[in-house]
């Protein structure tokens, strides 16, 4: 654990007059809680680097649940997120902080996270496709395996024009009833491909990921979502979060 690791800060808060408590996501150790001693002091060279969305190299150690940051280097400047992409980045940071256990390795998820924030930094339209792809990747890494391509009841490939009801721990079963737990075969194929060519498939992806993530998040509201509603225009909020 004393070697250098690629990492991102998910969240930070003051720990003392001169130190920070960091929640970081690392390539090799997963999510780790660190104390950055002296990082808040006026002479600290770390203060500017230990920010969300800045690619870092970290070295840390210690035996307890809270490790001690030994060294930190910024690999590059922070990825340029602002407005809706900033709130989207805060959202995925909060997701990781809420659902990942400490010190559980998720190397592939680390690169999914990196790809997501890079996509957000370069987005010119809605960030929702990038968010939905990351949520689906996260669910997969958590062991939430869902077959989007076949009916769980008959085993037959899904049909674009048919409707399927989602049942937890079983999958999608053909249904004649249409409600917020049903999806068309076309929507399921889009979820499987993680490609959302229109508003219909994008809305379906949001419905599914919200249902699937709910058991991991519990009833506690996401702070990033509340911040988004508070500071972004109502029309934007309705488009992206409702």
From Swiss-Prot:
Q: What induces it?
A: Encoded in the rnc-era-recO operon.
Coiled-coil positions: none
Q: What happens when the gene is disrupted?
A: No visible phenotype.
What Gene Ontology cellular-component terms does the record carry?
Answer: bacterial nucleoid
What biological-process terms (Gene Ontology) are attached? DNA recombination; double-strand break repair; recombinational repair; response to UV
Q: Which InterPro entries match?
A: ARFGAP/RecO, DNA_rep/recomb_RecO_N, NA-bd_OB-fold, RecO, RecO_C
Claim: DNA damage is one of the keywords in the record: yes
Q: Which residues cross the membrane?
A: none
Q: Which UniProt keywords apply?
A: DNA damage, DNA recombination, DNA repair
Q: Does the keyword Hydrolase apply?
A: no
Under SUPFAM superfamilies, the record lists: ArfGap/RecO-like zinc finger, Nucleic acid-binding proteins
Q: What does this protein do?
A: Involved in DNA repair and RecF pathway recombination.
Q: How does it assemble?
A: Monomer.
The entry's family comment says:
Belongs to the RecO family.
What protein name is recorded for this chain? DNA repair protein RecO
Source organism per UniProt: Escherichia coli (strain K12)
Gene assigned in the entry: recO
